Amino acid sequence: MAAVSVFQAPVGGFSFDNCRRNAVLEADFAKKGFKLPKARKTGTTIAGVVYKDGIVLGADTRATEGMVVADKNCSKIHFISPNIYCCGAGTAADTDMTTQLISSNLELHSLTTGRLPRVVTANRMLKQMLFRYQGYIGAALVLGGVDVTGPHLYSIYPHGSTDKLPYVTMGSGSLAAMAVFEDKFRPDMEEEEAKKLVSEAIAAGIFNDLGSGSNIDLCVISKSKLDFLRPYSVPNKKGTRFGRYRCEKGTTAVLTEKVTPLELEVLEEIVQTMDTS
């Protein structure tokens, strides 16, 4: 492979060889009655913001399976370490298992060093793992925490790239949430301001994206405390039933009634006795 790369002149631009390969495979599968698998559609709104004393993370609670709401109240804010939490978007199994694995590795790191892990350490572990799998692990993450160097907030993409920003959003409802952040964010906010801002951002994702919905969960991390607010608010409250919606028997008049007996022929009858001894 190295010899080929040495003797071949580099060619600029994009390579569309895989596109032609996929077209040939699709045509071949179509002849045999098969279809190529489609990409999994996922839906979530997760967000985080840095305030004066720490981090506020937020997420909705709807889990979808295609166009079906599979779970109305699932938790998308995952424990990494006592001072670090992580919101997950994408494939639910991938986000769960990825955060559990990194949490376990960070616990071993903490036991070895004798101190709480830094947020940058968790970020490095996550990005290296996701890059190793080249995007096949469908986990888009918002990592936040507070360590000896202060509050830190990262967005981690499924292919392993990361950003460190004062406010981040990810998921299918991220555009609506980002619009709220860009309009109302300001540096050095108080805790209540930050909680309200993240709640409004998640609510924007819930009301503008079908893949997001149900409740709003928040996680507030500072040097002095950790608050896991589940739920922080319920923007989609179920309506109250004020009465019975079934008609009483006899409400609808029966004009005619016809009963047709079924004539069945018993071909075989098997009787099994139950052992009562």
UniProtKB/Swiss-Prot annotation:
InterPro entries: Ntn_hydrolases_N, Pept_T1A_subB, Proteasome_bsu_C, Proteasome_bsu_CS, Proteasome_sua/b, Proteasome_suB-type. It catalyses: Cleavage of peptide bonds with very broad specificity. It holds the Pfam family Pr_beta_C. Transmembrane segments: none annotated. Signal peptide: none annotated. It is an enzyme of class 3 (hydrolase). The keyword Protease applies. GO terms for cellular component: cytoplasm; cytosol; nucleus; proteasome complex; proteasome core complex; proteasome core complex, beta-subunit complex. SUPFAM superfamilies: N-terminal nucleophile aminohydrolases (Ntn hydrolases). It is found in: Cytoplasm; Nucleus. Its EC number is 3.4.25.1. The active site is at T44 (nucleophile). GO terms for molecular function: endopeptidase activity; threonine-type endopeptidase activity. Coiled coil: none annotated. The keyword Amino-acid biosynthesis does not apply. GO terms for biological process: proteasome-mediated ubiquitin-dependent protein catabolic process. PROSITE patterns: PROTEASOME_BETA_1 (PS00854), PROTEASOME_BETA_2 (PS51476). Keywords: Cytoplasm, Hydrolase, Nucleus, Protease, Proteasome, Threonine protease, Zymogen. Residues 1-43 form a propeptide. Component of the 20S core proteasome complex involved in the proteolytic degradation of most intracellular proteins. This complex plays numerous essential roles within the cell by associating with different regulatory particles. Associated with two 19S regulatory particles, forms the 26S proteasome and thus participates in the ATP-dependent degradation of ubiquitinated proteins. Belongs to the peptidase T1B family. PANTHER family: METALLOPROTEASE TLDD, PROTEASOME SUBUNIT BETA TYPE-7. The 26S proteasome consists of a 20S proteasome core and two 19S regulatory subunits. The 20S proteasome core is a barrel-shaped complex made of 28 subunits that are arranged in four stacked rings. The two outer rings are each formed by seven alpha subunits, and the two inner rings are formed by seven beta subunits. The proteolytic activity is exerted by three beta-subunits PSMB5, PSMB6 and PSMB7. This is Proteasome subunit beta type-7.
